[in-house]
UniProtKB/Swiss-Prot annotation:
It is found in: Cytoplasm. SMART domains: YqgFc. This is Putative pre-16S rRNA nuclease. Belongs to the YqgF nuclease family. One of its GO terms (cellular component) is cytosol. One of its GO terms (molecular function) is nuclease activity. Could be a nuclease involved in processing of the 5'-end of pre-16S rRNA. GO terms for biological process: rRNA 5'-end processing. It comes from Neisseria meningitidis serogroup C (strain 053442). Keywords: Cytoplasm, Hydrolase, Nuclease, Ribosome biogenesis. Its main location: cytoplasm. Pfam families: RuvX (PF03652).
Length: 151
């Protein structure tokens, strides 16, 4: 258990094709879907993220860490960690990794309840998953912090 830091956060549901982004504030306990970063090179993706960082001025990042249902590493675990380290390196902000095991299931459930289907669903699914990741972080779920130093 942890207490989420004060201030604005940007959360990411990292994928090689799409990166869902959510924004929130721990003090208010609120988070909302923000954007989906798609396609292009890593430089193009980070340019899009830089615009969001400039607009929202976060104090830290939260990145979903994919693991299997039994808690073992997933093939995307390493890539998500690498993405988080790159965020830290480019923006010099702490990164919190959180277990994202059920974020997509939660996002699918929310979108079904809201009757969001088809192309609209695909366009917001990763954002809503990022929102679920951030919500779990705000609720005090387990998290691991990276602030530019290994160990």
């Amino acid at each position: 258990m942890h207490k989420a830091p004060k201030g604005t956060a940007l959360a990411f549901d990292f994928g090689e094709t799409r990166i869902g982004v959510a924004q929130g504030d721990a003090e208010l306990g609120l988070s909302h879907p923000l954007s989906t970063v798609t396609g292009g090179s890593n430089d193009e993706k980070f340019a899009a993220i830089a615009k969001l960082v400039q607009e929202w001025q976060p104090r830290y990042f939260v990145v979903g860490l994919p693991v299997h249902t039994d808690g073992t590493k997933h093939e995307m675990t390493h890539l998500s960690r690498k993405f988080g380290r790159r965020l830290n390196g480019r923006f010099n902000l702490p990164v919190y990794w959180v277990d994202e095991r059920l974020s997509s299931v939660y996002a699918e459930s929310l979108l079904s309840e809201a009757q969001v289907f088809g192309k609209k669903r695909k366009s917001v699914l990763d954002q809503v998953a990022a929102q679920a990741i951030l919500h779990g972080f705000f609720e005090g779920g387990p998290a691991e912090c990276f602030n530019g130093r290994e160990g």
